[in-house]
Amino acid sequence: MELPKEMEEYFEMLQREIDKAYEIAKKARAQGKDPSLDVEIPQATDMAGRVESLVGPPGVAKRIRELVKEYGKEIAALKIVDEIIEGKFGDLGSREKYAEQAVRTALAILTEGIVSAPIEGIANVKIKRNTWADNSEYLALYYAGPIRSSGGTAQALSVLVGDYVRRKLGLDRFKPSEKHIERMVEEVDLYHRAVTRLQYHPSPEEVRLAMRNIPIEITGEATDDVEVSHRDVPGVETNQLRGGAILVLAEGVLQKAKKLVKYIDKMGIEGWEWLKEFVEAKEKGEPKEEGKEESLAESTLEETKVEVDMGFYYSLYQKFKEEIAPSDKYAKEVIGGRPLFSDPSKPGGFRLRYGRSRASGFATWGINPATMILVDEFLAIGTQLKTERPGKGAVVTPVTTIEGPIVKLKDGSVLRVDDYNLALKVREDVEEILYLGDAVIAFGDFVENNQTLLPANYCEEWWILEFVKALKEIYEVHLEPFTENEEESIEEASDYLEIDPEFLKEMLRDPLRVKPPVELAIHFSEVLGIPLHPYYTLYWNSVEPKDVEKLWRLLKNYAEIEWSNFRGIKFAKKIVISQEKLGDSKRTLELLGLPHTVRDGNVIVDYPWAAALLTPLGNLNWEFMAKPLYATIDIINENNEIKLRDRGISWIGARMGRPEKAKERKMKPPVQVLFPIGLAGGSSRDIKKAAEEGKVAEVEIAFFKCPKCGHVGPEHLCPNCGTRKELLWVCPRCNAEYPESQAEGYNYTCPKCNVKLRPYAKRKIRPSELLNRAMENVKVYGVDKLKGVMGMTSGWKMPEPLEKGLLRAKNDVYVFKDGTIRFDATDAPITHFRPREIGVSVEKLRELGYTHDFEGKPLVSEDQIVELKPQDIILSKEAGRYLLKVAKFVDDLLEKFYGLPRFYNAEKMEDLIGHLVIGLAPHTSAGIVGRIIGFVDALVGYAHPYFHAAKRRNCFPGDTRILVQIDGVPQKITLRELYELFEDERYENMVYVRKKPKREIKVYSIDLETGKVVLTDIEDVIKAPATDHLIRFELEDGRSFETTVDHPVLVYENGRFIEKRAFEVKEGDKVLVSELELVEQSSSSQDNPKNENLGSPEHDQLLEIKNIKYVRANDDFVFSLNAKKYHNVIINENIVTHQCDGDEDAVMLLLDALLNFSRYYLPEKRGGKMDAPLVITTRLDPREVDSEVHNMDIVRYYPLEFYEATYELKSPKELVGVIERVEDRLGKPEMYYGLKFTHDTDDIALGPKMSLYKQLGDMEEKVRRQLEVAKRIRAVDEHGVAEKILNSHLIPDLRGNLRSFTRQEFRCVKCNTKFRRPPLNGKCPVCGGKIVLTVSKGAIEKYLGTAKMLVTEYNVKNYTRQRICLTERDIDSLFENVFPETQLTLIVNPNDICQRLVMARTGEVNKSGLLENLSNGSKKTEKAEKAEKPRKKSDEKPKKKRVISLEEFFSRKSK
């Protein structure tokens, strides 16, 4: 694939900058001051390297490069087949092995090393015999279900390659019997009907033609449990559907026949003339018409049907209600402080507007920034929404070319607020938000989520298409919207329409901003016969016809109307009507969305809205009368000359998810250097403080010994003689030390004790000595604090050089656990930008390779729109300020620590433009190199959708069982069930994340160092869209597990555990199986579960992987979790494997990562030299990124056919060919450039910078403001919101906190050691510090006041009120009994909701104000009265001793 010169230069420039950074990092690393002498982040290889690593054979990459350069990709693939079969890459043993290797390698070359086609798609390659014919040998390709993911072209090519391999091996062709042919005919049809609709459903004749002529057998394994009637066909091993084979034949060979013919010609393969004839015949012939014949029963039924007179829109609404029900799933949980913006599908919520702005699509909604302001800025740029449809979540970005809210002001006036500045001006005067405004949602999101298309609301981009269509049909003038048109055509059209040509030109070029005046819009409708312009169309169908009829009569009888005239067209200019006369019809005007003012007791409708109201009503010349089964617009269109389309059919609900994020990544607590200081640094882990106080720290740390002078210490370079030291390995039993060279000779085993050596030991260090030396080395003395870590969590326990920490402290930056410095940000997609938006001059952009705007005009102005290159990113100014500090740190590091020239020399953040970063996302396998091209004043990271999609995610299928402990009880549950045990779901960076457990849940992991099974906290659980395929690993004893192709898998190799990507794992690799015995129903708990030993090394075993299969994913989602510390989990039948990767979305400067990242620092790399976890992709290939982005639409406007099809409630997949998507360009140079958008915006950073949620303090204030917004939005029931906040957030929190108090751990204030039970002497056995509770009373009842406010002020269910009051009683009774001396006497408060409940039910309140006397108001029973009588003395129990506080208890003990 040849790219245009500009794009090729772009990638070459990126590679040059990458190579430059690597050269500098290599020079620095070569000095020996770091754990490794080389850079530890490898670059991803080119296509040839990918092919070799994916499918082999070894050594083929070099030859592929040579052949591709000489012959091109297609011929090179065949040449490689020749060389493999000739044995140039080694003896493969059998002809079948040669055939399999040749097919996989050739296909990998043709698909440029994409994983799915050569590995997962082809299950097997066999040489079989035509036993039913002449017993000759032929080649059979066995396809698996995941071949679907490789695309039709790759499927078809695999058949072509198979035929070439067959010829090279001298095999005969496949000679199918009639049984074989009819079996495939049945399978294709059955698959289409019973499993899933094929993109191309070939006729039986087409299937027979292909089967008779394809020279190899297309077969495969059973993929679906659907039996066929053509059973026991010779040579076919299954009687079930072979999904892979069906897809290859139908969607591969037959659907892609035309494309395949081009490859046949290019590669010179003979014997496929039949396919050329098939293509020619198909192009000449008439398309087949299905379903023309009608049965007698159907025709009779048709005759007996009763014709019901029903309006078009009325019937559409009925069909809409029947087929697409509102979905309240997103609104079932409402978090305190995060508003619900619209109830499900409620009119007045977000109005659906199909399209993709230059900063939306790809699970991102565009909304008018005025909407953000008028919802009290709870929505800001980058805020995440939980949505009703098409997906579950979206990020918000600003779009100014769509409609904003329609609001009612406190004086009764109604106003359209499409402008950001107007929103700021009127925000304090808004009483009600009648209509929330538009949400631009991409067609691609509907395709991705397979959501039925909702009827499109009438909008400017639809109207302009009808406008140009009418011009063409009536006047035969061809014009195009959203582009420059020929002057001649413009002149001709403007003559016909009698309008200014310049206005027509501008309106066609930008119809979203340039709107005709109302009188001209009416003129267009009359002349061209098109509906009234949507800007002047009111929400007629939001109002009942009877209400419009009443309004019509009032206007006819009482309104004062000022009329005007335009070219013989009469239109209203002003309407004045008394508010008293109007009465409740004032609400009708409001619901119509008609702007008007209220002044001096009159309702005044000014220009142009007077015409917008009266023109559809025929200027009151015909009588509007309500009609059964007719919507308002149906009645108007039946009577009026000027027709209307509905602008308000489809509404979508949403609530606020997670607020936007853009801040530096800090460990908790923040760390400046990965150096252990133990208890010597105090609770702040301050190394400088420990040094000043002359303390000695005792920590687990790796030491190194100088082979020359014998110096021992944590430094990698000897401070005395400058020699690179050797790591000292230590025997944990006898404490003998062995330098690396000696330990290697002993196979890292102590020769005395026969125990595995460790690379670290518990040693004493003197911080003062080490810090003074480091300060001298880098000449940094004035830092206030130097924050280290309590202890190293890595398996090597190698510390960072203290010099790095000093330089970080000097520049005020913080390190992450792997040695890098990161900045987190919410992902937001962008495909086009204006130079002024990102603060970059045109001259600078030209230097970066941006020479033209997106329309191909030379770049000369800061207001031109430019298409973003795929690996360029636009960071927030917050990120810019922080990365500037990081750049200064890196320069200091190079200069003061490594003695190399400074690299960035940045004084202001604009100096970072053009420099490279690495982008990482949650649960990903690789970083992607990006280039900074600008900064915006918004808390998001804008980047190309390809860039965001390149950060892949890895997980397990939902039915994977995992070993966990729930409320103290060990049990196995599925990952899907685990996900449901967490709450507070948010959508971030393309995955769903939940962090808040509903119960006390921990996961079991294996400490690979000790072999013990240990309990680990769960940081979060995730749910991600599933890939089309998974890898299934089957072990020698029958156990198995499945995972995504790129997921890390723990395997045992060369005496140690290492991590491999799933696709790298080979048959014969060994995995750990823990042979622990688990009593799932046991309810007993142990004193300290952290030391629980459910399994040990001698009871565990290593099992070989016997079989690896690529299988089709059965679910739409995959799941995983982040387990703290050990980062592995026990799944299915006790198989131990790695969890998902756990990094949050972040960027880091490339050179910082290359200099400072080390696998030796990573906590999950326990024991052994493992593969580096971070690989960077240097050249982005859209074919290899997350397939979600392949559905992104890339057109300038949606065609008229699309809007009309939405009225039929079609599946988006039926319109896949109508709107161009990224998928349509894959494999072509155009996949990188020429992408278009439908909606422009004035500024990608226009809108609130920070959500109000982040600015407010306590929960009560957040909830109050949340409910104020709910009250204001017509589409929201605030009482329902209050109920949901209580039931989904506050009550579970109150009850959960109450439960956690009784199960809490105890903590040492000094060293932070935690205890399940407190030591008897009340002091920490580790450091002698004070022991305190980890859950306080304040933490338990922090939401109680908020909850009581809600049940007092809002109409919630009585049951909910009582739950709150009972919870308050439980809290009070707990603390009365535990800490009686701290309880104050409760005074009866008549305003308290709970005490009022008691009084209402009993007529009295007990002294504590609790609900103990709550009854149903009936008289006491005799039994109850007896129960209240005082007991006899003998029955009385002795009084309980006074309960004392822990504080008092501990102080007494210590005296």
Curated annotation (Swiss-Prot):
The source's domain of life comes to Archaea
* GO BP terms in the entry: DNA catabolic process; DNA-templated DNA replication; intein-mediated protein splicing
Q: Keywords for this entry?
A: Autocatalytic cleavage, DNA replication, DNA-binding, DNA-directed DNA polymerase, Exonuclease, Hydrolase, Multifunctional enzyme, Nuclease, Nucleotidyltransferase, Protein splicing, Transferase
- Region (Disordered): which ranges? 1409-1440
Reaction(s) catalysed by this chain's protein? DNA(n) + a 2'-deoxyribonucleoside 5'-triphosphate = DNA(n+1) + diphosphate; Exonucleolytic cleavage in the 3'- to 5'-direction to yield nucleoside 5'-phosphates
**Enzyme Commission identifier(s):** 2.7.7.7, 3.1.11.1
Entry's CDD domains?
Hint
One example GO MF annotation: DNA-directed DNA polymerase activity
Which residues fall in a compositionally biased region of kind Basic and acidic residues?
1419-1438
Q: Which Gene3D superfamilies match?
A: Hedgehog/Intein (Hint) domain
Entry PTM? This protein undergoes a protein self splicing that involves a post-translational excision of the intervening region (intein) followed by peptide ligation.
* Record-linked SMART domains: HintN (SM00306)
Functional note: Possesses two activities: a DNA synthesis (polymerase) and an exonucleolytic activity that degrades single-stranded DNA in the 3'- to 5'-direction. Has a template-primer preference which is characteristic of a replicative DNA polymerase.
Q: Which NCBIfam families match?
A: intein_Nterm (TIGR01445), polC (TIGR00354), PRK04023.1 (NF003103), PRK14714.1 (NF011302), PRK14715.1 (NF011303)
Q: What family classification does the UniProt entry report for this protein?
A: Belongs to the archaeal DNA polymerase II family.
Assembly and oligomerization: Heterodimer of a large subunit and a small subunit.
Name of the protein described by the UniProt record: DNA polymerase II large subunit
Organism listed in the record: Pyrococcus abyssi (strain GE5 / Orsay)
Q: Which gene encodes it?
A: polC
